[in-house]
From Swiss-Prot:
Chain sites annotated for binding ATP: 11-16, 128, 169
GO annotation, cellular component aspect: cytoplasm
UniProt-annotated binding residues for AMP: 32, 37, 58-60, 86-89, 93, 130, 141
Pfam families in the cross-refs: ADK
Keywords recorded for this protein, A-Z: ATP-binding, Cytoplasm, Kinase, Nucleotide biosynthesis, Nucleotide-binding, Transferase
Comment text on domains: Consists of three domains, a large central CORE domain and two small peripheral domains, NMPbind and LID, which undergo movements during catalysis. The LID domain closes over the site of phosphoryl transfer upon ATP binding. Assembling and dissambling the active center during each catalytic cycle provides an effective means to prevent ATP hydrolysis.
Gene3D superfamilies in the record: P-loop containing nucleotide triphosphate hydrolases (3.40.50.300)
Species this protein is from: Brachyspira hyodysenteriae (strain ATCC 49526 / WA1)
Assembly: Monomer.
Protein name, as recorded: Adenylate kinase
Pathway(s) served: Purine metabolism; AMP biosynthesis via salvage pathway; AMP from ADP: step 1/1
Amino acid sequence: MLNIIFIGAPGVGKGTQSALIEKDYSISHIATGDMLRENIANGTELGKTAKSYMDKGELVPDSLVIDMLKDRIKKDDCKNGFMLDGFPRTIEQAKELSNILESLNYKISAVIDIFASEEIIIDRLLKRGRADDNEETIKNRLKVFENQSKPVLDYYSDKAKIIKIESIGTPEEVYAKIKKELDVL
């Protein structure tokens, strides 16, 4: 069973690489944003509660996201393994995730830290053409990501294999580096 945490700044290629990993290793890709939207769309109790926060423009509390994640990881499609994208973002979330996984008798196999230079990320995001992707906003998002991700990586340093991948080259070249690391786990 391969259980992966995927950490990377906006624009480093997490989505592209996650899709390739999901396909090759037959593991479920769990993105917290998608999970929230799915719970809301399905009208689950957790989804209704999350929607009440979102409708007020508030952040959905960690405890609610954790509960959704626990329900999600228990599903049959996670029995072969899973990949978490966008979670955990903080030490508190990482500790809660550890508690969940321990209760289910699961372990994190690896944490993939995918990175690129600020210049490359800014260039990629500006080319993406989203309304909220301007240089100042991107730099702020990168600073927030950097401040949050380093402590999470430190937390996992003695709990799982940390795989550092520089996101330079074609998506296929980057994936070849990831696959080489995952195949020895």
